[in-house]
């Protein structure tokens, strides 16, 4: 079996592994009620609607 020719340093090893653990962007969608950007599957912070119903009353 072959042996490593050179020591692999922590920085080189970790930067190589970084592509595996790269975080994906959160799902950001447009609210159908107020057309503001919001997280998917969450109540809109701007208008308080979720799935076409007003869940939270928002004071303006």
From Swiss-Prot:
HAMAP family: Ribosomal_bL32. Pfam families: Ribosomal_L32p. GO terms for biological process: translation. Keywords: Ribonucleoprotein, Ribosomal protein. GO terms for molecular function: structural constituent of ribosome. InterPro entries: Ribosomal_bL32, Ribosomal_bL32_bact, Ribosomal_zn-bd. GO terms for cellular component: large ribosomal subunit. It comes from the Bacteria. This is Large ribosomal subunit protein bL32. The gene is rpmF. Belongs to the bacterial ribosomal protein bL32 family.
